[in-house]
Design a protein with these regions (language model features):
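FAD-binding beta-loop-beta segment adjacent to the flavin cofactor pocket
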Residues: 292-323
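Helix-loop-beta segment of a Rossmann-like dinucleotide-binding subdomain
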Residues: 86-107, 116, 144, 253-255
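Active-site-proximal substrate-binding core of FAD-dependent oxidoreductases
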Residues: 319-325, 341-384
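Predominantly flavin-linked oxidoreductase catalytic cores and closely associated redox partners
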Residues: 108, 117-278, 338, 342
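N-terminal FAD cofactor-binding segment of flavoenzymes
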Residues: 35-83
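N-terminal Rossmann-like FAD-binding beta1-loop-alpha1 element of flavoenzymes
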Residues: 3-31
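A short alpha-helix-loop-beta-strand transition element characteristic
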Residues: 58-75, 128, 194-202, 353
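Glycine-rich phosphate/pyrophosphate-binding beta-alpha loops
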Residues: 104, 317-330
Length: 389
């Protein structure tokens, strides 16, 4: 199967790439592969969303029945001791950590809605088809991907339901797999995209969705915490977002550069939920969903080159998360939009994909990540100094 553009991954960056491509040229044949059974099935819900990229991509999103409904109405930041908590005035927090213009959303629902917008423009979306292999031309340029064979038993034998994988060929292939995408890692190594860059850094994030008692629910509340149960030298903290329908998105992030070999991130999350400031909110509630994900935290200094012959990297496949904002959806979307502009220029002018670098450096995304470049490294001095920095 041949297309103008093949996109791997149905998250914010991949879907934004697809939408922008069709906006720029409705005649392009664009397909998007998603490994999950449906768009959003592998997205951990719960997100404080900055609409900057969406305002550019779909300026009329408010009229398109989007799932973006719950505005942030109130913020709290707590330093936790073992049993006590100290409330930090939110007006003392850096502007990048203030959320009064943002929304509490389900990221999975946002992706489902973006998929609807993409399909309405003519994008072909194939859920349930994980890309398993990168295909190359004789000159070494990426020419597409192959999906994995289906109907293989545990011993590698073909079952009656066997279906061979398919090759999807594109003039350009966009990799939008998310953090540590297995194909993206191969490309970074093969094309030395991280040459002269700082080593990438990672964290692990746990997220749960709770349905809590009405008396404990405050729709529009965003709360973050730092401190207990982690020590001052370990990077990490929590978030709690009060969404609609008495739901709370509760999560905990720990940097994987922690020094204590006995530390268990999962157990620290469980301890965190026993703190009186947290327990009083979720007590009597019901956990209805949970999961964990790797997070890419290296920031600006660790960003690999995002273009190579025949392909582009976008979103967390490259590492566009803004750590001080604790946000990556709007940056992932913008990186996908830049990829679409690059591809459009490439098809119009015949230049190679290196123009991505020029468009990226002229964008607000580059400026935002550049301004945030030293925040994560500052936490090597300890929690308090890192927050002050």
């Amino acid at each position: 199967m041949e297309y103008d553009v093949v996109i791997i991954g149905g998250g914010p960056s991949g879907l934004s790439t697809a939408i922008k491509l069709k906006q720029l040229d409705s005649n392009l044949n664009v397909c998007l592969l998603e490994k999950a059974s449906e768009i959003g099935a592998h997205i951990l819900s719960g997100n404080v969303f900055e609409t900057r990229a969406l305002d550019e991509l779909l300026p009329n999103w408010r009229e398109l029945n989007s799932p973006i409904k719950t505005k942030v109405k109130k913020e709290k930041f707590l330093f936790l001791g073992k049993t006590k908590s100290l409330s930090w005035p939110t007006w003392l927090l850096p502007a990048v950590q203030q959320n009064h213009k943002n929304y509490i959303i389900s990221l999975a629902n946002l992706c489902r809605w973006l998929a609807e917008q993409a399909e309405s423009l003519g994008v072909e979306i194939f859920p349930g088809f994980p890309a398993s292999e990168i295909l190359y031309n004789e000159d070494g340029a990426v020419k597409g991907v192959a999906t994995q064979d289906m109907g293989i038993d545990k011993d590698g034998n073909k079952k009656e339901s066997f279906e061979p994988g398919i090759e999807l060929l594109g003039k350009v292939t966009v990799f939008a797999e998310g953090c540590r995408g297995h194909l993206g890692k191969q490309l970074i190594e093969k094309f030395e995209l991280n040459k002269d860059k700082d080593p990438q850094q990672y964290g692990i994030g746990f997220k749960e969705i709770w349905e809590i008692d009405d008396k404990n629910h405050e729709e529009g509340l965003v709360m973050h915490t730092a401190g207990w149960p982690l020590d001052n030298s370990t990077y990490g903290g929590s978030f709690m977002y009060h969404a609609e329908n008495k739901q709370v998105f509760l999560g905990y992030v720990i940097g994987l550069d922690y020094k204590n070999p006995h530390l268990s991130p999962y157990d620290e999350f469980q301890r965190f939920k026993t703190h009186p400031a947290i327990k009083k909110i979720i007590e009597g509630g019901k956990r209805i969903s949970y999961g964990a994900r790797a997070l890419i935290e290296g920031g600006f200094q660790s960003l690999p080159k995002m273009f190579m012959p025949g392909a582009l990297l976008v979103g967390c496949d490259a590492g566009t998360l803004n750590m001080p904002k604790i946000k990556g959806s709007h940056t992932a979307m913008k990186s996908g939009m830049i990829a679409a502009e690059t591809i459009h220029y490439h098809f119009q002018k015949g230049d190679d994909l290196s123009v991505y670098d020029k468009i990226f450096k002229e964008s607000w995304l580059y400026k935002e990540l550049y301004r945030a470049r030293n925040v994560k490294p500052s936490f090597s001095w300890g929690l308090i100094l890192g927050i002050i920095f």
